[in-house]
Every structure is written in C-alpha cells, then in structure tokens.
Amino acid sequence: MSRSLKKGPFVDKYLQKKVEALNTANKKEVVKTWSRRSVIFPEFIGHTFAVHNGKEHIPVYVTEDMIGHKLGEFSPTRKFGGHGDDKKKKK
C-alpha cells in the first residue's frame, strides 16, 4: 500500500537539515545515515549518502533518476551467495 497523497513524501528532519546545510555551504561530503525510509528529494542530487544495510554503510550517489525512490532501495540488505554446486559434475 502506498502513502496517502495528502500526507506527502517522508524525509527524516535531521537528514534534510544536513543536506540543506551542505547546499548552503556548497560542500560535497558523505552523509552517513540509518534512515532507509527517507524519500529522495531533488535537493539531494549530487550528494553521496552512506546508507546502512544492517551491517555496514553502502555509499549511494544520488542522480536525477532516483528522485521519488527511497534511500534503502539502493542499499541491498541480503547477500546472494549463489546456488550450491553439483558435486557429481566436479569429478
């Protein structure tokens, strides 16, 4: 189920304040965040976010195509180890 249109998109306030401060100072720093639920706004373009995936922070560089998506979509939480090998074929 998607979010109600009358509520609008969600962004953590501390994250938005950090980006606004970087934009006013014209700095490009990596912003470390645990907020995977925050929606990407146009002000975020050109910034790099270190998004936590449960174990480590994955760097995510924001481009125009990412607007409207959530930060967590670009930081996978599961690691695919591959399917098991067939031991009969190895001989």
Curated annotation (Swiss-Prot):
<comment type="similarity">
    <text>Belongs to the universal ribosomal protein uS19 family.</text>
</comment>
<dbReference type="GO" id="GO:0019843">
    <property type="term" value="F:rRNA binding"/>
</dbReference>
<keyword id="KW-0699">rRNA-binding</keyword>
<protein>
    <recommendedName>
        <fullName>Small ribosomal subunit protein uS19</fullName>
    </recommendedName>
</protein>
<dbReference type="InterPro" id="IPR023575">
    <property type="entry name" value="Ribosomal_uS19_SF"/>
</dbReference>
<dbReference type="Pfam" id="PF00203">
    <property type="entry name" value="Ribosomal_S19"/>
</dbReference>
<keyword id="KW-0694">RNA-binding</keyword>
<dbReference type="GO" id="GO:0006412">
    <property type="term" value="P:translation"/>
</dbReference>
<dbReference type="InterPro" id="IPR005732">
    <property type="entry name" value="Ribosomal_uS19_bac-type"/>
</dbReference>
<dbReference type="GO" id="GO:0000028">
    <property type="term" value="P:ribosomal small subunit assembly"/>
</dbReference>
<dbReference type="InterPro" id="IPR002222">
    <property type="entry name" value="Ribosomal_uS19"/>
</dbReference>
<dbReference type="GO" id="GO:0005737">
    <property type="term" value="C:cytoplasm"/>
</dbReference>
<keyword id="KW-0689">Ribosomal protein</keyword>
<dbReference type="InterPro" id="IPR020934">
    <property type="entry name" value="Ribosomal_uS19_CS"/>
</dbReference>
<feature type="compositionally biased region" description="Basic and acidic residues">
    <location>
        <begin position="82"/>
        <end position="91"/>
    </location>
</feature>
<keyword id="KW-0687">Ribonucleoprotein</keyword>
<comment type="function">
    <text>Protein S19 forms a complex with S13 that binds strongly to the 16S ribosomal RNA.</text>
</comment>
<dbReference type="GO" id="GO:0003735">
    <property type="term" value="F:structural constituent of ribosome"/>
</dbReference>
<feature type="region of interest" description="Disordered">
    <location>
        <begin position="72"/>
        <end position="91"/>
    </location>
</feature>
<dbReference type="GO" id="GO:0015935">
    <property type="term" value="C:small ribosomal subunit"/>
</dbReference>
